[in-house]
Amino acid sequence: LVARTMTQAERWLERHHDEQFFLYVDTWDPHEPWDAPDYYTAAYREGYAGEQIYPAYGNYKQAGLHRDDVDLGHATYCGEVTMVDFWIGRLLAKLDALGLRENTLVFFTSDHGFYFGEHDYFGKAEWVHDAWAIVAEGSRMPSWLPESWLLTVGWSPLYGEITRIPLMVRGLGLEPGRRTALTTVPDLTPTILELAGIEAPASVQGDSFFGVLTGERDEQRSFVVSSWPLYFAEGEITLAVDSRPRHISSYMPLTVSTRDRSLILGGPDDEPEFYDLVGVPGEQDNIWESQTREGLKLARQALSFLEEQGTPQEHVRPRRMSLERFAAGNARGNSDRTERPQQWVDKEAG
């Protein structure tokens, strides 16, 4: 798909290169299925001629897969990424050939990452499957994957492997280098508009990180919020992916990230997960019970941010209920506050 998409993008540029333009190109790849030609994947799994491995979309061990299955999937994914890299290079070369390098801004980013065994996940979400599903002959892709409405969407935490995405910017006057400021996808639009000399409409959310790109400042945000749609709640039905109805079996969590901490908030029955990204990298050691006060502070900031963006209370309330419940046994143990935890959260979370 990426080959056809980039070829069409090149042709579009040939027709419109002498005009002012905004071109958005969605490669789709490296989305699964990872079926790049063998010459792309050979560097990562030389000589493999077996079946294609499809993500388990959940705990790969519980799905009956082994570590080598995940590694095979990762190899074909890497082949897909290499293919995408080649075709993006073609598009950039076309810009150069048309004389557009010096007056064209290029932004490269993605929507999310993928789990390849981290936290025992293989996929990007927890899909709770029909226990009686039959595996399709000659493939590890279950036959119900494209067919069964019995599929349900379960608890799917957004760890760093999902939330950290690439962002590369090329443009006239921007010096090569790396930036470590925290940004989020809504910041892209106002940044592009500012770089193009266009005033952002009042309806545009997000904040421009133009100053970060030019080196005028080092910071953008103190924290960022990543989430599934907050209306993905227990008992709801989603038609996402292919318009087939699928049940949602739990509140979909959101993740609050700073430079050195991450916090995962779910529904009323879900205990928060709080991680020290510096002391124990990889989000493996939940410190919520020992650092509840710090976790609550970050949670209050995140919930206030959601409210400022106009998030309906019906979507904020379940997260606050989780804090009220799971702070009860911990907040006084690691803080000098004396109020009841529920009062504390209600008062300071807005």
Which stretches of residues belong to each language-model region?
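Catalytic domains that recognize anionic headgroups
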Residues: 1-350
